[in-house]
């Protein structure tokens, strides 16, 4: 083995060892989410929210593959007849945040839903979608008042990141738009949460 290829092997091995030490998903019951491609994480979110609606007896039709348009369409489906865009993110190991790519025209659907998956729980956030003006304004997000929506170069796609602590904080406000799932959360709690927000 040449000195150069040996150096590359050693560098890859060192990075792999760091990665193994940082594996926050190692003991998670849904640890396979960490190995999925980003678009498949999105499909997990869509199918999971559809499943929650079915378990709750809430009318829903969700299949983002049939509603997509370049730059963003009218959402991934409908819940209670209302259009909903669903964004699913997993907690990053090196960057402890949930990163949501919102597309170029995220204001088209009536509602936005974030499913933020952590190793030991998940957060479901649903809110009436923002207007085009709100997305472009650089003002704080009304449902996450310490954050702003990122609009890349004022012409591309929009992005919004949350964190575990931010979700916990927002779940504690009165009439919260964020729900924390734990082992004790019942399907009735989820049903009441969805029905309270999507009207």
Annotate each PLM feature:
Residues 1-82, 87-199:
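Nucleic-acid endonuclease domains
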């Amino acid at each position: 083995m040449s000195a150069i290829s040996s150096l590359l092997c050693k560098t890859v091995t060192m990075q792999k060892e760091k990665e193994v030490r940082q594996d926050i998903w190692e003991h998670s019951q849904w640890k396979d989410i960490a190995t999925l491609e980003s678009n498949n994480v999105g499909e997990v979110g869509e199918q999971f929210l559809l499943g929650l609606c079915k378990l709750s007896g809430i009318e829903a039709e969700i299949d983002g593959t049939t509603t997509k348009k370049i730059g963003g369409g009218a959402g991934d489906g409908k819940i209670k007849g209302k259009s909903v865009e669903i964004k699913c993110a997993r907690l990053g190991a090196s960057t402890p945040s949930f990163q949501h790519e919102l597309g170029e025209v995220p204001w088209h659907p009536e509602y936005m839903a974030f499913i933020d998956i952590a190793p030991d729980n998940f957060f479901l956030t649903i809110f009436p979608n923002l207007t085009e003006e709100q997305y472009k304004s650089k003002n704080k997000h009304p449902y996450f008042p310490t954050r702003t929506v990122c609009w890349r170069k004022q012409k591309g796609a929009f992005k919004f990141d949350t964190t575990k602590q931010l979700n916990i904080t927002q779940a504690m406000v009165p009439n919260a738009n964020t729900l924390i799932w734990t082992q004790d959360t019942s399907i009735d709690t989820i049903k009441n949460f969805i029905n309270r927000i999507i009207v």
